[in-house]
Amino acid sequence: ETKNYSMGEGGAIVINNEKYIEKAEILREKGTNRSQFFRGQVAKYNWVDFGDSYLQSDLNAAYLWAQLEKADEINENRLNTWNSYNKAFSELQEKGIISLPVIPEGCVHNAHMFYIKCKNLETRQAYIQFMKENDILCVFHYVPLHSAPAGIKFGRFDGKDEHTTPDSDRLVRLPMYYNIDKNDLQKVIEKTIEFFSKE
């Protein structure tokens, strides 16, 4: 539901500099120069560098390829949903009730997700529960990596945690998927406005 394109495990990489293509092939081919072998560039393939098993099945690759062929249509659909949310909730932001995503000037996005930031954790939890009671799935987005078990063990946090943890406590994702029904989208908008009109 949350990904713009999905295929199970796997993906596609876009390389805009030819000097990285060979390195990417080797990485994908478990550290071998197998792709060069299949092109007849080497007599046999060998282990030549770091790599892993990143190859997906042909069926999964075909499933992804079909989506990539429709990438513009998929992105436009998601952007329409994103823009509908953003427009519908702009008044709530103007009143200081919620915060909306900020897209810096000169930047574009692919509408991967739409989120709002509530005033605090308690409001977020109440909002998620209210939406659940109305058969709408809204979820919090992430737990800061520095507070995860591996983050505590291996990482560090530089500076003062003024935004990361507080924002993760406030952030909630709204339903965002290809071909969301217009009635469902309107319901999300109406129930969100209903909840926050009490704030």
Label each PLM-derived region with a short phrase.
Residues 16-199:
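PLP-dependent aminotransferase class I/II
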Residues 8-13:
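Glycine-rich phosphate-binding loop of ATP-grasp-fold ATP-dependent ligases
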